[in-house]
């Protein structure tokens, strides 16, 4: 994974708390146990402070997971950590919803709130 | 964009707090980076004070974005600013939901609350 | 409109706060600007005090709007006023959802709460 | 109606507050005004105290309404009263949703909370 | 049932409260009254403390119910007890939704919260 | 069952083959084996010859099944026979779709075509 | 009803058989028996010959039914007759789907094919 | 599997070709390779000749697959063979739709037609 | 409109008849009567002969309609003509589905088949 | 791509024409133009002759496309060719449905029929 791929641009409305949600239904990584691909939808929700994440760079950041072996829980928390570091938001949440494996479906949700 | 297109009429029930929601699923603007059109749904929710926005004028106001190059975040905040200025509501919220680009879907939500 | 059409019957369980919701997806009135018909769904929700509204009389009350020219906001607030007057409920809410005009959909929501 | 049909069994987990929801989409009674059948879905939600309602007996209790003439509001409150008496729950709610009559759909919701 | 089948792995992000939801729509057990199979969906939601439940072991744990005679309420509370014991979470919830029997559908929801 | 309840009116467009479909999702009869009610949707499709079936009389005809013990297959064929006899259509089809019993759902479809 | 309201324009592609479908979900007329309004969706499908129906005039033609007392079967066949006369199509079909009355839903379908 | 569990009753309308569809969404068997359970929906469609299959016996016949190791293709063809032998229908079709394994969903469809 | 924007590439499987469907839900043009934008979905289906249409060039071709005043029927037939000329397919169909105007929805379908 | 990964097993019912459908909604390959991943659903339908395709081997065969650059049309025809060669079916069809790119969705369908 390469968090350095993430680019930002300046928030034009820093005085107003507003929410940006970016949904990527085409996320794929690899199960470190079986070596088989996992498929999921990654939802990013945040309230920007001074920076917004640039969409195309976010897409390229996500693409780096394509051939990486990593568990659901760690995908979710890693993306949250990388994006918090890059964007320094007021609040941020990552929801990862995974296609069924063995008939069983998993969703992981992690949140961050900046100290006030 | 021409906020002066926005017309209002007098709220007949100013003593009661009630909510008006106006959904426009046929909004289109242009991506300033690629020059390609963006398509979205703009939802306006507000509690009127003394004025209500006139529907037809709102439609013509939205149409002015058709060939304008502007980012998702700025569309949302600009519409909120223009409508708050024209309608002077008690509360107002703009939700813009955008069709997928590169497989990725974006929603931006901004709110305003009048000082009491 | 004829609020005198509204009939009530005695609430058999006045000591318990319970909710009655009545949805009419076949409401129609006339746009006072264009003279063309509007179509909507009117949802009535209330907590009865001593009276409940009689269903058939409510239907006939709604029918009186069929050829009346009246704006969305006023339909909603007028129905709320008429029903509050007839039923004297503890709480009441009217939600009117209107079919698209010019591609734009409107919903108006108004509430009433009796003084305690 | 025969509330004596309702049977209960002992709650095996009385120290934990948990919720049981039982949905019957095949409820039918008779309109006392027209003599025509009404069709509805009855949803029962409760937090058991020492007793749980036995499913088959609940089904037979509901069947007793099949040829009884009774209004929507009274069906809902009567079922709540009968079940509260039989099951002595910590909390209980009855939601009755009725098929359209004259194009109009009705839902009645009544709740009970035991004194603590 | 064999709670000893449940395996855990170390939570890599113990300092952050995040939620894991695991849905199994292919659960089946046997009705102790009729000897006929029951079919349901078991949803597990929890905030891990130091441990996460291993998915494959959870699947094998669920499979042990396949030929066991047990009531809906007990399935739900037993799974909660076994998982709380194995995973020692901060919070945990089990929702069991059962296919209709005699036209009637049942859902049981039980929760656990660790003492703070 | 009382086929004599079925009333007809004269087809105003006998020279044109057109189709009438009448769907009754509120049909109920009784299972002759268990004595428990069955619930279903009866769909009638026909091409009228000289007569059309009158809607209200059809409703009253269907109501006669409410407390009658009769199997799915026989309900379907009996309704087809009674309606063919009363309406003398060019073509007619009855589709009965029944709510699940023991988790199993049944649909029966029977057709009639007049000799040409 | 006023078939003279129907206007047409010249088909620009008379040498190609193509299909035009126009769906009006906001049709309303009056039941001649009860005097109560009926609500339906009218679908028009046709292959134009030399003429196409003008949309706005079609809308005004439909509006004339708003306060007319007329049965479902006759609405359908009358609209077909009026449109065939005005548009002289190669083929035409009218489907009228009506909201439930007494829990029962009706659909009427009538077709026309020009002699070749 | 025990085809001898299948019971039949006499078709009361042998002179009319009509269709019976019986859908069982609660079918389960075991994968002979992995020993893990498979879940599917079995749809049976047939035109009876002199016999109809009795619903309860069909349910018990299906239950015998619960702990049997058998492939999708063979489940489908075996059920068709057993039912054709027991019911001697004019036509019969079995559709088995299986829940995803490894993200992949399978449906098998087999038909029988009696010689005329 | 600029048909010269359409680019093609060589069909790699010219000996097999196969179907390509390309759906564009983001089509917009302008109503020549009102000057207001129309929104629609254009579906292209074809069996290639020696050429396939290049996707990006198709997108740019569609974009040329954005500010052009043209009726539904002509959009559909014009696109068909331009694509037939550029791609020389064995068969081709264009379906244009338009968002409601005045509550009324229109779909136009036109087909082409090469002489054999 | 490695067609040699495809394994088969003997069809146990070679005398009966029956259909097997296998849907893989987790297919991904790479666009040869942009180097970005494509996502699609591959549906395989076939009537087996003497052989059936083994599910797990089919999954591994599909996985080989994960990092291959190949156009939609060629994916579809290549899979058909490989599977026809391995399985020698009576009939076979491949349907590939691709997620939107630039707002535009593509579906490719190719079929094979053995000579009789």
From Swiss-Prot, chains A, B, C, D, E, F, G, H, I, J:
GO cellular-component term (any): cytoplasm
- Catalytic residues as annotated in Swiss-Prot or TrEMBL: 31 (thioimide intermediate), 38 (proton donor)
Native species of this protein? Chloroherpeton thalassium (strain ATCC 35110 / GB-78)
Report the EC number(s), separated by commas if there are several.
1.7.1.13
The molecular function GO annotations come to: preQ1 synthase activity
By sequence similarity, the record places it as follows:
Belongs to the GTP cyclohydrolase I family. QueF type 1 subfamily.
The UniProt function text for this chain reads: Catalyzes the NADPH-dependent reduction of 7-cyano-7-deazaguanine (preQ0) to 7-aminomethyl-7-deazaguanine (preQ1).
Keywords attached to this entry: Cytoplasm, NADP, Oxidoreductase, Queuosine biosynthesis
Identify this protein by name: NADPH-dependent 7-cyano-7-deazaguanine reductase
Q: In which pathway does it act?
A: tRNA modification; tRNA-queuosine biosynthesis
């Amino acid at each position: 994974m390469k968090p350095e791929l993430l680019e930002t641009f300046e928030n034009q409305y820093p005085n107003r708390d507003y929410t940006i949600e970016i949904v990527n239904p085409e996320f794929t990584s690899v199960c470190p146990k079986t070596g088989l691909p996992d498929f999921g939808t990654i939802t990013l929700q945040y309230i920007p402070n001074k920076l917004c994440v640039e969409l195309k760079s976010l897409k390229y950041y996500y693409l780096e997971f394509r051939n990486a072996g990593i568990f659901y829980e760690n995908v979710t928390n890693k993306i949250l950590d990388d994006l918090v570091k890059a964007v320094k938001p007021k609040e941020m949440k990552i929801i990862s919803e995974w296609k069924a494996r063995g008939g069983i479906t998993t969703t992981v949700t992690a949140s961050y709130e900046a100290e006030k």
